[in-house]
Amino acid sequence: MKLEDMTLDLEQQVEVKADIGDVFKGVLYRFGEGSTNPNGESMQMILEQWAGGRWFRDRGNGIGHLWGHVQVIKPPVLLELSGPMFMSYPALNHVELRLEQIAGGTKVSLRHRAIGLLDAGHREGIGKGWGHYLDNIRKDFADGVAAQRA
């Protein structure tokens, strides 16, 4: 296996028309209880919002999957998660979400870096998956859903 097949470095961004503090709360919601798959079904994710907190999928009846831990949480500008994520094989992942106040709203930048025996299917689908997360955050503020949760 070549080194380039064993590494991943993906960056995506979205602009959200809302205040940075509100968007940060929206990020926490979408990475936790508000996490859905592209079909809109709940991913049953839990995000413990403190350094060292777990990020995991709780399917009930003792069934679950640890996606990672909160490495850094610095409201309202930074959330870093590290762990196996959705990869049930030898791999290390780091996801960084940076928020920046811009004219008219907030820019959310996501960077996912990984190293390990990366599955080709995961490599191909990662961009779509994170795009879904970011698009949901943007849509929450575009249609007022996030304001209703606050």
Task: Mark where each language-model region is.
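Short acidic N-proximal helix/loop "leader" segments that mark the beginning
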Residues: 1-11
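Hydrophobic pocket/interface hotspot
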Residues: 23-27, 55, 70, 81, ...
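Short beta-edge strand/loop motif at the mouth of beta-sheet-based domains
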Residues: 11-12, 18, 22, 29-66, ...
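Hydrophobic-ligand binding "helix-grip"
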Residues: 45-47, 56, 60-103, 113-116
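Conserved beta-strand segments that form the floor/walls of ligand-binding pockets within enzyme
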Residues: 9, 15, 80, 98, ...
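A conserved amphipathic terminal alpha-helix motif
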Residues: 114-150
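A short small-residue
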Residues: 6-8, 110-117
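Residues at helix-coil transition
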Residues: 28-32, 75, 135, 139-143
